[in-house]
Design a protein with these regions (language model features):
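Short, low-complexity cationic-aromatic patches
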Residues: 27-38, 45-54, 97-108, 114-127
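Terminal domain-initiation and capping elements
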Residues: 2-9, 28-32, 63-66, 106, ...
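Short amphipathic alpha-helical segments
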Residues: 15, 19, 34-42, 57
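Extended intrinsically disordered, low-complexity coil regions enriched in Ser, Thr, Gly, Ala
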Residues: 47-80, 117-139
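Short, solvent-exposed interaction modules
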Residues: 64-117
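Amphipathic alpha-helical segments within well-ordered protein domains
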Residues: 19-22, 41-45, 91, 110-114
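Intrinsic N-terminal pre-sequences and regulatory tails
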Residues: 1-19, 23, 139
Length: 139
């Protein structure tokens, strides 16, 4: 059972991730940033084979993991296997808000993951993704 202290710590970690992403995007709106994070995490999740998607999810902090797995239906999912499909998945996730550049969000979220997860975890995820999506990750 998660106690109050653990929940407060999990909240703090999730807020750090949001603050980091807001800085990377140059945004000041936490709601929009959270929506963009969730949309990009869903696109990533849907670009990976099921086992690889689970491996990535297991590396995320608990509240970010909740965003990642929200509304996931592994058997009925539509794969984001091309760059266009990946970016469309992000755009759909932010309700096609024209002020949000899906490409910038993809780069920022993948850079956030690269900064906060181990290099080995990132390389494993990249290896499982379609080659068309590799250049969305930081060099």
């Amino acid at each position: 059972m998660v106690g109050t202290l653990e929940f407060a710590q999990a909240t703090h970690i999730a807020e750090e991730w949001l603050d980091d992403l807001m800085a990377r995007l140059g945004w000041h709106d936490r709601y929009r940033t959270c929506a963009a994070l969730a949309a990009a995490l869903h696109a990533l999740r849907d670009a990976l084979p099921q086992e690889a998607a689970i491996d990535v999810g297991n590396q995320l902090p608990i509240l970010v993991r909740g965003l990642y797995y929200d509304a996931w239906h592994p058997r009925g999912r539509s794969a984001a296997r091309t760059r266009a499909a990946f970016l469309a998945r992000i755009q759909d996730g932010v309700h096609r808000e024209p002020a949000i550049d899906a490409d910038a969000v993809a780069h920022a979220v993948l850079a956030l993951l690269a900064a906060r997860l181990t290099a080995a975890e990132i390389e494993d995820a990249k290896a499982e993704m379609p080659h068309d999506l590799h250049n969305l990750w930081p060099s």
